[in-house]
């Protein structure tokens, strides 16, 4: 699997915000309406919209419109891809060249 480093750098930047990490944790329990997420954080609707836009643009979250409300769920395909990529980045074989370097 070839890694798109620019794409994953953007995803990790999105994940670097504690509030967005907590939103992902909340969504791990299943789909949630935006109003439930907003209640948890006691934030304004524009602030929530900004965070959810970043999560959706990263591909980690799927939006679903129902009337005037938006419901959010984890994109499990993208989450599994993220887990595999992190694993690939952390494989010992990836670091052997660095460990064997004689120029220290």
What are these regions (language model features)?
Residues 51:
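Residues within the DNA-recognition helix of helix-turn-helix
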Residues 3-46, 66-80:
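N-terminal helix-turn-helix DNA-binding core of bacterial DNA-binding proteins
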Residues 39, 56-57:
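Alpha-helical residues within the helix-turn-helix
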Residues 2-7, 76-104:
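Amphipathic alpha-helical dimerization/coiled-coil segments
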